[in-house]
Amino acid sequence: MDIATNAIDCIHTTAASHGRVFIVELMGHKVGWLTLHAGIAGGADIILLPEIPYNFDAVLMAVKQRNKAGKRFSILAVAEGAISQEDAQLSKKEYQKKKANSPFPSVSYELGKKIQDALGQEVRICCAGSYAARRQSGCL
C-alpha cells in the first residue's frame, strides 16, 4: 500500500510543473481496494476501479473542470482491471477478443490516448510495479 500511495504522491510535482495528465496504473485486476485506498491517500484526482465501470465522458469532464479551475494537471489512479461502461456491456468472449486485438497493452494506455486526443494535453502512463507493491519489507 505504501508503494502504491507513494507512486501517486511523488508524481504530483512532475504533473504540476509540466501541466500533464498522469495515469498511475496499480494492481487490481478484479478488485480495486488497493487503487481506491492509494488513490485517496496519494491525492489522485480521479480513481477508476474494476467494480464500477467508468464513463469516459465523465472522466474527460473531470479533467476539463480541473483545467478550467486553473489546475493544469490531473492524476488518475487506475486499477489494471478498470473497464469502461461500453466494454462492460460486451460478453466475456467479446471483451477478451477486443483486448487481444487492441494495440494498447492495458486500459491505462487506451484511456491515455483517448484523453490526449480529446484535449490535446500531454498524458503520461506510470505502471507502479505490481511486484514491488506485493513485496514484504526488507525484500528490496
Q: Which residues make up each language-model segment?
A:
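Accessory alpha-helical/coil subdomains and C-terminal extensions
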Residues: 1-18, 22-121
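C-terminal active-site/capping subdomain that shapes the small-molecule cofactor and substrate pocket
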Residues: 110-140
